[in-house]
């Protein structure tokens, strides 16, 4: 019976036509609809040709509730919505003019000393620490602070921004500074999420939520203008990434031995795999970032040893990381926009040694920090519950 049906011309034509229709449906994007049915994230569409101002909707944010008589309202706030109603999507990112410190402070009146913020009318669903390695890039830092504070406030997170300064004139070590930042941030609070953030990358879409994925490390800078808004290669883990403290410790943090530019991102991606975890990413249309243009940094030249180190990662990752981290904490300062941590992390043992200590490179770095301290709001009565004023000095 079936054989006779298949031999009929009309039946064969119907089968061939059905196959062609299915193929056309999939080629025109139907696969995305099918994927959504099975729980895969659908690629959202955004119009980046009409971005919103980075400070959009902040005027809609209510202040803390007040009871009759002017006293603070009782505690017991509801949780913030899973998706903040304040989000606008694509935001305008401009590199000129570089905002002054006074302007950034004025535009962010709800930010507390140390760069802390939490929503006034709802309980945040995530507490996120933003950790930024830094040296001698004050213009970049101001641009980041100007754009990042309103970006995070619209997401209704509780957050704190930590800027980790490498003291001395030795070779820059981004990954080791991030290890220092994680350790110092976790002394302050039990953060839910750690965002490791390059100072020269500015997010362009506030739907790119600064929260962690409990299933594994998350790489969020998936579409930078530097790379034509696409991922440069599949295992890329550079720019901006997010891990829970448990995920960070499971992979032994980041490597300490990468002095200079290059290599540490690939080492970190390898650590994720060796620790039995998988990298997740937001959709390309969401993870947009603009990179601030800059010349090559003195003291951050290309690392000639990076390939030798990468070959050893499989054997070295359990010995080189948070469990081998040594540094000297030189200062911890609560400025109006961020917590500034200055650390002596030593020098590259393979290269020419330079003085390491509280000696800052030429430029405005020290003046910038002094200005931050001078503009710090007056102390409030009682201790700050989330800031560590008595961090010990010495080796860690």
Swiss-Prot record:
The glycosylation sites are: 57, 169, 340, 388
List the stretches on the Lumenal face of the membrane: 32-396
Listed GO molecular functions?
Answer: beta-N-acetylglucosaminylglycopeptide beta-1,4-galactosyltransferase activity; galactosyltransferase activity; metal ion binding; N-acetyllactosamine synthase activity
Q: Which cofactor does it need?
A: Mn(2+)
Name the keywords, alphabetized: Disulfide bond, Glycoprotein, Glycosyltransferase, Golgi apparatus, Lipid metabolism, Manganese, Membrane, Metal-binding, Signal-anchor, Transferase, Transmembrane, Transmembrane helix
CDD domains from the xrefs? b4GalT (cd00899)
Ranges for the region named Disordered are: 341-396
Q: Which residues bind N-acetyl-D-glucosamine?
A: 263-266, 306
Query: Cytoplasmic side of the membrane: what ranges?
Result: 1-10
Q: Which cysteines are joined by disulfide bonds?
A: 80-122, 193-212
Pathway stated in the Swiss-Prot or TrEMBL entry = Protein modification; protein glycosylation
Annotated UDP-alpha-D-galactose binding sites: 133-137, 172-174, 199-200, 229, 261, 294-296
Supply one GO CC term from the record: Golgi apparatus
- TM spans (from-to): 11-31
Residues where Mn(2+) binds: 200, 294
Q: Where in the cell is it found?
A: Golgi apparatus, Golgi stack membrane
Q: Name one Pfam family in it.
A: Glyco_transf_7C
Q: Which reaction does it catalyse?
A: an N-acetyl-beta-D-glucosaminyl derivative + UDP-alpha-D-galactose = a beta-D-galactosyl-(1->4)-N-acetyl-beta-D-glucosaminyl derivative + UDP + H(+); N-acetyl-D-glucosamine + UDP-alpha-D-galactose = beta-D-galactosyl-(1->4)-N-acetyl-D-glucosamine + UDP + H(+); a beta-D-GlcNAc-(1->3)-beta-D-Gal-(1->4)-beta-D-Glc-(1<->1)-Cer(d18:1(4E)) + UDP-alpha-D-galactose = a neolactoside nLc4Cer(d18:1(4E)) + UDP + H(+); a beta-D-glucosylceramide + UDP-alpha-D-galactose = a beta-D-galactosyl-(1->4)-beta-D-glucosyl-(1<->1)-ceramide + UDP + H(+)
Which spans does this entry mark as compositional bias, Polar residues? Answer: 353-368
Q: How does it sit in the membrane?
A: Single-pass type II membrane protein
Q: Which InterPro entries match?
A: Galactosyl_T (IPR003859), Galactosyl_T_C (IPR027791), Galactosyl_T_N (IPR027995), Nucleotide-diphossugar_trans (IPR029044)
Q: What superkingdom heads the lineage?
A: Eukaryota
Q: What is its EC number?
A: 2.4.1.-, 2.4.1.38, 2.4.1.90, 2.4.1.275
Which family does the record assign?
Belongs to the glycosyltransferase 7 family.
Q: What does this protein do, in the record's words?
A: Responsible for the synthesis of complex-type N-linked oligosaccharides in many glycoproteins as well as the carbohydrate moieties of glycolipids.
* Name this polypeptide is given: Beta-1,4-galactosyltransferase 3
Native species of this protein? Bos taurus
Chain's gene name: B4GALT3
């Amino acid at each position: 019976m079936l054989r006779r049906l298949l031999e009929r011309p009309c039946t064969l034509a119907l089968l061939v036509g059905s196959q062609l229709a299915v193929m056309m449906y999939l080629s025109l994007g139907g696969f995305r609809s099918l994927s959504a049915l099975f729980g895969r994230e659908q690629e959202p569409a955004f119009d980046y040709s009409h971005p919103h101002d980075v400070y959009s909707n902040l005027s809609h944010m209510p202040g803390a509730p007040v009871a009759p008589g002017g006293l603070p309202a009782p505690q017991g706030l509801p949780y913030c919505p899973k998706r903040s109603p304040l989000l606008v999507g694509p935001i305008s990112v401009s590199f000129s003019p570089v905002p002054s410190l006074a302007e950034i402070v004025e535009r962010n009146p709800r930010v507390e000393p140390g760069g802390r913020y939490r929503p006034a009318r709802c309980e945040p669903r995530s507490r996120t620490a933003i950790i930024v390695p830094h040296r001698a890039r004050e213009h970049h830092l101001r641009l980041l602070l100007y754009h990042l504070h309103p970006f995070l406030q619209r997401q209704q997170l509780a957050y704190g921004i930590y800027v980790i300064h490498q003291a001395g004139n030795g070779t820059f070590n981004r990954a080791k500074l991030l290890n220092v930042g994680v350790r110092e941030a976790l002394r302050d609070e039990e953060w839910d999420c750690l965002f490791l953030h390059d100072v020269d990358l500015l997010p362009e879409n506030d739907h790119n939520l600064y929260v962690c994925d409990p299933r594994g490390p998350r790489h969020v800078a998936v579409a930078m203008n530097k790379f034509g808004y696409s991922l440069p290669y599949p295992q890329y883990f550079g720019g901006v990434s997010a891990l829970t403290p448990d995920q960070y410790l499971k992979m032994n943090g980041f490597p300490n031995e990468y002095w200079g530019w290059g290599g540490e991102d690939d080492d970190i991606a390898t650590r994720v795999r060796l620790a039995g975890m998988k990298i997740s990413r937001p959709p390309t249309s969401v993870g947009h970032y603009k990179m601030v243009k800059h010349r090559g940094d003195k003291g951050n030249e290309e690392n000639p040893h990076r390939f030798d180190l990468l070959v050893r990662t499989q054997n070295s990752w359990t010995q080189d990381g948070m469990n081998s981290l040594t540094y000297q904490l030189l200062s911890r300062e609560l400025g109006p926009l961020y917590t500034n941590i200055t650390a002596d992390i030593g020098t590259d043992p393979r290269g020419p040694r330079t003085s390491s200590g509280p000696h800052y490179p030429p430029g405005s770095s020290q003046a910038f920090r002094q200005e931050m301290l001078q503009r710090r709001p007056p102390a409030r009565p009682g201790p700050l519950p989330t800031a560590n004023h008595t961090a010990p000095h010495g080796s860690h």
